[in-house]
Curated annotation (Swiss-Prot):
The modification N6-acetyllysine is found at K170. This is Copine-1. The keyword Transcription applies. The lineage of its organism: Eukaryota, Metazoa, Chordata, Craniata, Vertebrata. It is found in: Nucleus; Cytoplasm; Cell membrane. GO terms for biological process: neuron projection extension; positive regulation of neuron differentiation; positive regulation of phosphatidylinositol 3-kinase/protein kinase B signal transduction. Belongs to the copine family. GO terms for cellular component: cytoplasm; membrane; nucleus; plasma membrane. Keywords: Acetylation, Calcium, Cell membrane, Cytoplasm, Differentiation, Membrane, Metal-binding, Nucleus, Repeat, Repressor, Transcription, Transcription regulation. InterPro entries: C2_dom, C2_domain_sf, C2B_Copine, Copine, Copine_C, VWF_A, vWFA_dom_sf. Residues 1-113, 122-244 form the C2 domain. Calcium-dependent phospholipid-binding protein that plays a role in calcium-mediated intracellular processes. Involved in the TNF-alpha receptor signaling pathway in a calcium-dependent manner. Exhibits calcium-dependent phospholipid binding properties. Plays a role in neuronal progenitor cell differentiation; induces neurite outgrowth via a AKT-dependent signaling cascade and calcium-independent manner. May recruit target proteins to the cell membrane in a calcium-dependent manner. May function in membrane trafficking. Ca(2+) 1 binds at D21, D27, D79, D81. GO terms for molecular function: calcium ion binding; calcium-dependent phospholipid binding; phosphatidylserine binding.
Length: 536
């Protein structure tokens, strides 16, 4: 079993950001990046806060904390003026670098924002506080309001809610809803937020709810406020009067500025990757190796399949890197391994899913070393040919994943590792295979070996939006992760694995959550403690 790490939640706020927008304040967003083998990789980002030079971000940033590793982090603040996810066309308001260890040991760390080394971003600062996520429970709530005060001269109010928890003698933002335009009787979208972040895990923690009218210049008008606790919010249908303190003092017959009604409020367990793995889910690992002619003659030192005097090449290095991590999650350590794009004996027909051990009824290899041995033995026995077709192997693994899904339990998940030297040939068939597989307990990892153009692979990765078939059917979720091997060839071997496997836990959990499947063995529920409602 791999080492279990602690999940840390980072809350971010900034002060005195420089203004890049003419006539208004910036619309800041915070991006968190981590140093991965000398390259900065984005982990997550907060929401955008409109027209604010001292934002307190509602969305937290979550990261796994490894005591044994120096985890270098970079926080980037950007002024977002468009809807594209890319940041290259947005103004950079400043950044700061530190390690996660620094934040954890300080609990709250304030750093000056820098435009570049030696050049401060005005008086801008960033404050990051860390909180260990010990509780996997989430608060799920659905809220509406009725008869809110009209705040806009030419229209109705544009209301939104903010929930603040009391802590360290001040009110800390826990959640902010979306804005409902021009509506005095709004219903906000259902939302979920971690119990720890919402109320520190304590159902009796004072909660302040503020209802405000959104203004594009950032000068939001207070409609009303009320105080409560999560325990009271759970007593649905719960109704609270929104009171404007100044109106209450000025007007003798003032009653309220509207009411907020909690339609649903539940505390639910949000299972993690470790919950599923430790609950008994097996991760089934399958390997597919590219034996197309573009790799070059294996006997030539220029070939990607050429085995060096030490018996390795890029294919084997990538296989070891990823396989050595994944094999810890498979109890029998028997892995099916296939080749594709080669002419195979005895009839020398081109095959796109031949067993590396030439035993189609039992293609399993004992451990990663077994795959390596089968690869080395197969190499001189096949003729490299083509084309580069992925669909047959993806569909092969998908058939097993479909059988597992029929059990309707979180018992198995499938990871297919494809090692290839070039662009896929059967693009349409592969897109359809991936879209079909996205409905199954399965992920696909593609490692590009060599220096070819891998643009088509980036399309399969679909980071810019859901992958679609030619007929327009969209993938149910993103299940493909592609990386070119040579980006990591000078980095420690574990760096490649960390990158290509980074999305698998999220992909696995998203599938099981969508199906509504709990871990086979549910984790113990928290006992009596701060997260329990007060006793009468």
């Amino acid at each position: 079993m791999a080492h279990c790490v602690t999940l840390v939640q980072l809350s971010v706020s900034c002060e005195h950001l420089i203004d890049k927008d003419i006539g208004s304040k910036s619309d800041p967003l915070c991006v968190l990046l981590q140093d991965v083998g000398g390259a900065w990789a984005e982990l997550c980002r907060t929401e955008r806060v409109r027209n604010c030079s001292s934002p307190e971000f509602s969305k937290t940033l979550q990261i796994e904390y490894h005591f044994e590793t120096v985890q270098k982090l970079r926080f980037g603040i950007y002024d977002i003026d468009n809807k594209t996810p890319e940041l290259g066309d947005d103004d950079f308001l400043g950044g700061a670098e530190c390690s996660l260890g620094q934040i954890v040991s300080s609990q709250t760390l304030t750093l000056p924002l820098m435009l570049k080394p030696g050049k401060p971003a005005g008086r801008g600062t960033i404050t990051v506080s860390a909180q260990e996520l010990k509780d996997s429970r989430v608060v799920t709530m659905e809220v509406e309001a009725r008869n809110l005060d009209k705040k806009d001269f030419l229209g109705k109010s544009d209301p939104f809610l903010e929930f603040f928890r009391q802590g360290d003698g001040k009110w800390q933002l826990a959640y902010r809803t979306e804005v409902v335009k021009n509506n005095l009787n709004p219903t906000w979208k259902r939302f979920s937020v971690s119990l720890q972040h919402f109320c520190g895990g304590d159902l009796s923690t004072p909660i302040q709810v503020r209802c405000s009218d959104y203004d594009s210049d950032g000068s939001h008008d207070l409609i009303g406020t009320f105080h409560t606790t999560l325990a009271q919010l759970q007593a649905v249908p719960a109704e609270f009067e929104c009171v404007h303190p100044e109106k209450q003092q000025r007007k003798k017959n003032y009653r309220n500025s509207g009411t907020v009604r909690v339609k649903t409020c539940r505390v639910e367990t949000e299972y993690s990757f470790l919950d599923y793995v430790m609950g008994g889910c097996q991760i089934n690992f399958t390997v597919g190796v590219d034996f197309t002619g573009s790799n070059g003659d294996p006997s030539s030192p220029d070939s990607l399949h050429y085995l060096s005097p030490t018996g390795v090449n890029e294919y084997l290095t990538a296989l070891w890197s990823v396989g050595s991590v994944v094999q810890d999650y498979d109890s029998d350590k028997l892995f099916p391994a296939f080749g594709f794009g080669a002419q195979v004996p005895p009839d020398w027909q081109v095959s796109h899913e031949f067993a590396l051990n030439f035993n189609p009824s039992n293609p399993y290899c004992a451990g990663i070393q077994g795959i390596v041995d089968a690869y080395r033995q197969a190499l001189p026995q096949v003729r490299l040919y083509g084309p580069t077709n992925f669909a047959p192997i993806i569909n092969h693994v998908a058939r097993f994943a479909a059988q597992a899904a029929q059990q309707r339990s979180a018992s198995q998940y499938f990871v297919l590792l494809l090692l290839t030297d070039g662009a896929v040939t059967d693009v349409e068939a592969t897109c359809k295979a991936v879209v079909d597989a996205s409905k199954l307990p399965m992920s696909v990892i593609i490692v590009g070996v060599g220096g070819a153009d891998f643009e088509v692979m980036e399309q399969l990765d679909a980071d810019g939006g859901p992958l679609r078939t030619r007929s327009g059917e969209a993938a149910a979720r993103d299940i493909v992760q592609f990386v070119p091997y040579r980006r990591f060839q000078n980095a420690p071997r574990e760096t490649l694995a960390q990158t290509v496997l980074a999305e698998v836990p999220t992909q696995m959990v998203s599938y099981f959550r969508a199906q509504g499947w709990a871990p086979l063995k549910a984790p113990p529920t928290p006992g009596k403690g701060p997260a329990q409602a007060p006793q009468a």
